[in-house]
Amino acid sequence: MVNPYNQDLDANSANYQPLTPLSFLERAADVFPEFTAIVHGNLRRSYAEFYLRSKKLASALSQQGMTRGSTISTLLLNTPPMLEAHYGIPMCGGVIHAINTRLDAATIAFQLDHADSQFLLYDRELSAIVKEVLSQCKVKPQLIEFIDKEHSYESLDNFDLDVIDYEEFLDRGDSNYQWLMPENEWDAISVGYTSGTTGDPKGVVSHHRGAYLLAQGNAMVASMPKHSVYLWTLPMFHCNGWCFPWTMSAIIGTHVCLRQVRAEPIWNSIKNHKVSHLCGAPIVMSVILSQDQKNRFNITHEVQFFTAAAPPPENILREMQESGFLVTHLYGLTETYGPAVINEWHQEWNSLDMNAQASLKARQGVRYLPLEHLKVLDPDTMKQVPADGKTIGEVMFQGNIVMKGYLKNKSANQKAFEGGWFHSGDLAVMHPDGYLQLKDRSKDIIISGGENISSIEIEEVFLKNDCVSAAAVIAIPDQKWGEVPCAFIELKKDQNWNEIHAKQWCEENLASFKVPKYYFFENIPRTSTGKIQKFVLREKGKSLTGTN
C-alpha cells in the first residue's frame, strides 16, 4: 500500500531549509538590533554590529578564496573576534577550527597540517607560540592578528611574518555580503581535536544540524530566558564553547567576555552585568571561591554554574551554594558537541544532607534534551548492563548531537560507530533511577582543570629519555584541579635520575598543564602478559599522595 502522506508532498525551498545556528544571529539583529550582544571591558557591541562584523569577516575570507570546505583556524582567547569567528567563518562556507591556546607548538602544528588550515586568526599575546608553530608545520596559513585594545600587552613588536591586522581585514569585507547557507544541514561547521590518547589527535567534525540542536537544547536545559547574561569562563575553544556562542544569539542574550579566569573580574562581572549563567571545570569554582570574603558581595539574583569533567568536591559544592550559585553537573565529549548528559536535580533532593547531595551530584546524570539515546552497554554483547549501580559497561550514544565523524580517519570512524552506536570509551554504571555515573576511562584520560590530558602522551615523553626504561601515568584526585597526572617511572640500570630531573624533562617537552604533579621511582606492576596494571597504580598513588 502506498502511503498517501508521502505522495506529491516532496520537500522544496518553501517548506525545507537546512538547520544552522547562523540563522540565530540574523534573527537577533533583525528583531533586537540595538540590544547589547557583547561586553568586553569598556567595549559594547549591539546585535546589529555583531551581525555586520560577522558578515564582513565572511566576505573578507570569501574574497581570499575561502568557501565551502575551507578550514580557518583560530588561536584566540575569549574575546569578541572569537565570537565573530563562530559566525563569520561558517557564513562563507568555511569550517572553524578553534585551537586550544594552552597546547604546545608541535601539537598545534599537527592540527594545522591535518586540517589543511588556510587562515589562522590569533591574539597578539600568542604571537611567540605562533612563530614556533609556523616553523614546524607544513601548511602556511595566512595570518590575521588581533590586537585587543582592552588589554595591555607586554610587547607589541612584530615578528618577521606576513601578518594582517584583524580590524584592517574586516574593513576589506562587504557589509552587504550575502552569506552562504549550508547546502545540507549535515555540512561541517567545525572541526575540533581530541587530546590524542592513542597516537595523534583526531579531528572531530561537527555539522550545522547538531550545532543548531545543541544550541537550542542549552537554552532549554539551562532554563535561559530571553536576554540572559553569559560570562565566558569556559574557553570557547572547548567544543566551540559547548555551542553557547550560538545559544546566546537564539535567546538574544549578552556575552560578557573574559580574557583570563580570575576571581575579581568574575565577581565584578556578576555584580556589574548581572551575569545569570557561566560554565567551566571545577577549577573555575575554586577560582571563584578564592576571592576574599571581604571582597565578595551577596548575590541577589540567580546565577547558574554548569560544570563538567571530574565531579566537584563536596566542600566546593557547599561553598558555591552558600555563595549564591546553583551548580549543575554535566558530562559530554568533543564528539557530542560538548554536554550530552545532565544531572537533572529533583526538588526533593534539597531536603537531604550535604553528604547525600554531594553523592547525587557526583553522578553524571541522564541524556541531554537534544540527545536521542543514552545507554550503558556491554561492548562485547552490545546489551544493556543491569541498572544496579554496580555493573560496569561502556557509555554509548545515538542522536543528532553525535559528531559527523573523525576527519580523514576511516578506521577510527568504523570503530567509533560499530553496532550503530557511538562508543565513548568511558566506563560507567547505571543506577536504578536511570542516572549514570562514570567509573573509569578506558582511554586513560586525565581531566585536569577541564583539560583532557592523555596519559599515553606523557608516558611517551618519559620513554624518550635514555634514563627511563618504563613509565606509567595515572590520574590522582586534586582539590584544586579535579585531577592531576601522577607518574610512576622505572629507570634503567645504574641511572641517577630524580624528581627534579623528571619534572624538568616534562617541562621541556610538554604543555605546562600536562606536567605531572607527582613522581615515584619504582618497579611498575604488570600482568603475566606484560601489561601495566594501572588499577594497582591508582590505589598505590592515592596511598602515596594521601588522596582519595
Regions of interest found by a model, annotated:
Residues 16, 26, 34-79, 83-87, ...:
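Conserved AMP-binding/adenylate-forming core of the ANL superfamily
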Residues 33, 144-145, 157-193, 200, ...:
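Conserved pre-ATP/AMP-binding loop-to-beta segment of ANL
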Residues 46-49, 189-213:
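Conserved AMP-binding A3 loop
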Residues 63-64, 91-168, 492-495:
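Structural core segment of the AMP-binding/adenylate-forming
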Residues 77, 122-132, 234, 261-265, ...:
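Adenylate-forming
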Residues 103, 110, 120-122, 278, ...:
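AMP-binding/adenylate-forming catalytic core of the ANL superfamily
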Residues 212-229, 237-277, 290-293:
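Conserved AMP-binding/adenylation subdomain of ANL enzymes
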Residues 271, 303-305, 312-330, 334-435, ...:
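Conserved AMP-binding/adenylate-forming
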